[in-house]
Amino acid sequence: MFGLGGQPQLSSQQKIAAAEAELDLVTDMFNKLVSNCHRKCIDMNYNEGDLNKNESNCLDRCVAKYFETNVKVGENMQQLGQNFSPGKF
């Protein structure tokens, strides 16, 4: 609790700020995913109301790669954070 090596207690305001920051990151990632995969996979001349098979397959692969990359980057960042200590340079 008080300096016993545990996690510091966050105030309600800090928790709200952290949740808002996380929501902003998730929203930004989603918007980038939609923009990038749409630009890559969907022809700008809309001829049909539905996706064709090639567009659908491309979107599936694009989204899967985007999430896979996001997971790998997160794992690497977490590992870097664990390897870093104040006395280590």
From Swiss-Prot:
Principal cellular location given in the protein's record: mitochondrion
UniProt motif (Twin CX3C motif) ranges: 37-62
Keyword Cytoplasm (UniProt): no
GO molecular function: metal ion binding; protein transporter activity; unfolded protein binding
Gene Ontology biological-process entries: protein insertion into mitochondrial inner membrane
Comment text on domains: The twin CX3C motif contains 4 conserved Cys residues that form 2 disulfide bonds in the mitochondrial intermembrane space. However, during the transit of TIM10 from cytoplasm into mitochondrion, the Cys residues probably coordinate zinc, thereby preventing folding and allowing its transfer across mitochondrial outer membrane.
Subunit structure, as described in the record: Heterohexamer; composed of 3 copies of TIM9 and 3 copies of TIM10, named soluble 70 kDa complex. Associates directly with the TIM22 complex, whose core is composed of TIM22 and TIM54. Interacts with the transmembrane regions of multi-pass transmembrane proteins in transit.
Protein name as annotated: Mitochondrial import inner membrane translocase subunit TIM10
The organism of origin for this protein: Eremothecium gossypii (strain ATCC 10895 / CBS 109.51 / FGSC 9923 / NRRL Y-1056)
